[in-house]
Amino acid sequence: MTNLLINVDHVGTLRNAREETFPDPVHAAARCEQAGADGIVFHLREDRRHITERDVRLLAETVNGKLDFELSTEEEVVSICCDVVPDLATLVPERREEVTTEGGLDVTASRPRLNAVTDRLYDAGVDQVSLFVDPVPAQIEATAAVGANCVELHTGDFAEASTEAARREEAERLAAAADAAHEAGLRVHAGHGLDYNNFSLFRETVPHVAEVSIGFAVMARAILVGMDQAVRDMRATVANAQP
């Protein structure tokens, strides 16, 4: 079965919008795990717009399942990741002006730096290192060449497709990328924009997906039905959509 990791960034977004101490991403993570999540994802951005270093260290101490630390290659953030040693480190692109991550890494253009950071993460004791990339063959090949043992496929174009035909076309593109990643020996992860409505088509079409990261859809639903129910609903969606 595909593992479900819940991203708690937007709990921090809500907290920080009022410069409050609540809601707490650490408490939210515990509720997500209690409701059936296989693990927790967070992105420590350079500008600390949602998750803070305090959150990171408490999540590292309290999460019982898998912990996925999303990060750029910025030196301070890499050092923090090496210090807390998550189960998985996912390298992502980052621009201060973006609202959310807008696309995958250009691994082919950044191989020396990505190679150095990947090696450093392994040396620190991180078991899995993943690169977040668009479903493009050249990026899959470069991910393997850099030394990562996982790849996270960017599903944003699939999620944002305006027609059913376009969405199916993007699903097939993701399927080809997943096949290529599997052939290259990479563990396949996926995320960005996956939700209760589009996940079935995604999973029925795209093979080899060991793990998905879903955040915004779950947090938005939690406002209406509560965190426990939102996570349980997503857990059921993932379980029922196996190929």
Swiss-Prot record:
Domain of life: Bacteria
Keyword Lipoprotein (UniProt): no
Residues that hold 1-deoxy-D-xylulose 5-phosphate according to the record: 9-10, 45, 50, 100
Catalytic reaction equation(s): 3-amino-2-oxopropyl phosphate + 1-deoxy-D-xylulose 5-phosphate = pyridoxine 5'-phosphate + phosphate + 2 H2O + H(+)
One Pfam family linked to the record: PdxJ
Disulfide-bonded cysteines: none
Gene3D superfamilies listed in its UniProt record: Aldolase class I
Compartments where located: Cytoplasm
Keyword entries, A-Z: Cytoplasm, Pyridoxine biosynthesis, Transferase
Pathway it works in: Cofactor biosynthesis; pyridoxine 5'-phosphate biosynthesis; pyridoxine 5'-phosphate from D-erythrose 4-phosphate: step 5/5
Enzyme Commission designation: 2.6.99.2
Positions annotated as active site in the UniProt record: 43, 70, 192
InterPro entries, sorted: Aldolase_TIM (IPR013785), PyrdxlP_synth_PdxJ (IPR004569), Pyridoxine-5'_phos_synth (IPR036130)
Gene Ontology CC entries for this record: cytosol
GO molecular function, one term: pyridoxine 5'-phosphate synthase activity
GO biological process: pyridoxine biosynthetic process
Residues of the site described as Transition state stabilizer: 152
Family: Belongs to the PNP synthase family.
Assembly and binders: Homooctamer; tetramer of dimers.
Function: Catalyzes the complicated ring closure reaction between the two acyclic compounds 1-deoxy-D-xylulose-5-phosphate (DXP) and 3-amino-2-oxopropyl phosphate (1-amino-acetone-3-phosphate or AAP) to form pyridoxine 5'-phosphate (PNP) and inorganic phosphate.
Protein name in the entry: Pyridoxine 5'-phosphate synthase
Primary gene name: pdxJ
